[in-house]
Amino acid sequence: VGIAGAGVQGFYQALYACVARPIDTVYVYNHSDRDLTDYLARLEKAIDNPDVKVVQCKTAEEMVKNSEIICTTTPSTQPVLPDDKDLLEGKCIIAIGSYTPEMREIPDAIWDLTNEVYIELPYACEESGDLSQPIKDGRLKEEQTILMSDYLAGNPQEITDPKKTTYFKSVGMGLF
């Protein structure tokens, strides 16, 4: 799993991912040059599994390249992931940050890879810049958003296509 953002939210997303899935390596990328030695040690201790390595990545590209699941947990106003559809293809992207219309973590390349985004609540389309900006620019239509409750109430199928990119935009509802 790759984590963009070495703050409290990133810490707990990494921890939860390791509980929910069989993760062998957590790749952490932070946009600043802050020394993450203590952060990585605390995360490794909290995960409490000697089979899970915690690795700091120098670039977002390195983190994305090495990760199947990517969680973005930043207050950025610019995309934190590379705008490279080849790098993003086949990834599961979970965007946790971007909680105002001015914030943005996810690049436009995502819309070349998927025509749908899973959301918790309809107001995500207004609240998050990751959705409101692409809607305003015509790259995303509100009809392309799928409520997680609707998806889960259906008969969700396991995604077996390794090239399929999935995108979930969270606005902070703790259920998902």
Where in this protein do the model-derived segments appear?
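A short helix->loop->beta-strand "cap" motif at the edges of active sites that frequently abuts
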Residues: 23-24, 88-91, 114-115
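An anion/phosphate-binding loop that grips the pyrophosphate of nucleotide cofactors and donors
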Residues: 66-67, 114
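NAD(P)-binding Rossmann-fold cofactor-contacting core
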Residues: 19-47
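Glycine-rich adenosine-cofactor-binding loop
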Residues: 1-18, 30-35
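Rossmann-fold NAD(P) dinucleotide-binding segment
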Residues: 61, 65, 77-92, 105-108
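Short acidic-hydrophobic, aromatic-tinged amphipathic segments that line or gate anion-handling sites
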Residues: 52-62
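Adenosine-phosphate binding glycine-rich loop
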Residues: 99-176
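Short glycine-/small-residue-rich Rossmann-like dinucleotide-binding loops
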Residues: 68, 74-76, 97-98, 122
